[in-house]
């Protein structure tokens, strides 16, 4: 029972505490609400006061801004008025100027009208004077025709003939002076380029023969080479196409033939047979075939070495092999391969001096005589064969034209083609480069003098300097100075057309006038 009472008391106390707490909290909340309301009222009052102050401040600032804008607007209006006034003044001034110009133009127009009237009157006077002058001229012409017994056309023809004679003489003099100046300048420039090229190119003096000599260990070997009833020597000559000359020359056999490649093949084969000691037809045939292969390989190596030395690359392999064959070809005793290399060097050097393509120039110079490698096997001149080869192996058009034109058969179409022809002549004409037989030499000198003396007015001619120059003495009363120049050109053209010669020939016409008096 006591526990129940305590529980009830506890519940009662809790209830009383809750009620008391509720009222206490309510009173506290009401107090807070009243305080918040008072604070809110205070804040609202302060905000109203601040808003009033800001309003007054904004009004003041707005008034100041309005005053400032009004002042600026007044200033701008004043400036615009001033500018408009200035523009108006300028327009008025321009209008006054235009008025003055208009007056000036009116005055000028009046002056021009007066001048036009004056010119019309003057033109009429001139026409009248021209008419009178025409009548006077006609009368004078009629009188002159009556006095001179010549018509107008006849007199005109006589005057024109005299003028033509005088003018033709003056033109000839001017042409001569121009030729002299052009020749001097061209010779000077050409000598500079050629001297530079020759100084930088050192070439060998080459002389080739048509025989080769094979040394023997003893004279007994000659009998073995001949063989029983000459079978060995006949076999060797048949296979190589070379003549073997076995005479009293001690320990030597001479090989004679005009084909250097065959002669070289025979020399190598015979040398191998002599070293081997076994000499009979079957062995000879074997050695000749082996030697032929060695020569072909050597020719290919020579072609490759040549292109490497000259600096020409990209040639067709067959063209390289044909180029190597030039080592065994000669022209007037000059080795054609050495000549081609020399022409390539000279052409390249001259092309470099003139600003042309040096590599292309060397290529053209190296291949200019390529036709000589097979001209004894194929029909046609070496120029035609060379053009066919270059075209077949798709060489540059400049190279093809250089081959075709280096002997003047066709016109050169490029500077490089002209340089190739010049280098070819330079290489062939240098001392010691080529040789010719005595008979051909004498025939050429006689032909030079015969051509020179075939012209009227030539007194005597002399071929000098081994046929490099011909001097012609003319009659001074028959040929004047201008005719002497024409004679030199005509003789030069005939020499170029009728003679075949290496290098160039100088034609000199000498006209000498002597005045002789005797004092007594």
Curated annotation (Swiss-Prot):
Localization per record: Cell membrane
Q: What is this protein called?
A: Ribonuclease Y
Q: How does it sit in the membrane?
A: Single-pass membrane protein
Cross-referenced Gene3D superfamilies = Hypothetical protein af1432, K Homology domain, type 1
One GO cellular component this record assigns the protein to is: plasma membrane
What is known about what this protein does? Endoribonuclease that initiates mRNA decay.
Identify the main location.
Answer: membrane
Its top-level enzyme class, in one word, is hydrolase
Keywords from UniProt, A to Z, are: Cell membrane, Endonuclease, Hydrolase, Membrane, Nuclease, RNA-binding, Transmembrane, Transmembrane helix
Q: Where is the HD domain?
A: 336-429
Q: Which residues are listed as membrane-spanning?
A: 4-24
Species name: Bacillus anthracis
Q: What's the family?
A: Belongs to the RNase Y family.
Domain KH, chain residue ranges per copy: 210-273
What would you give as a GO molecular function for this chain, any one?
RNA endonuclease activity
GO BP: any one term:
mRNA catabolic process
What PANTHER family does UniProt report for this protein, alphabetically?
Answer: RIBONUCLEASE Y
The EC number on file is 3.1.-.-
The record ties this protein, via CDD domains, to: HDc (cd00077), KH-I_RNaseY (cd22431)
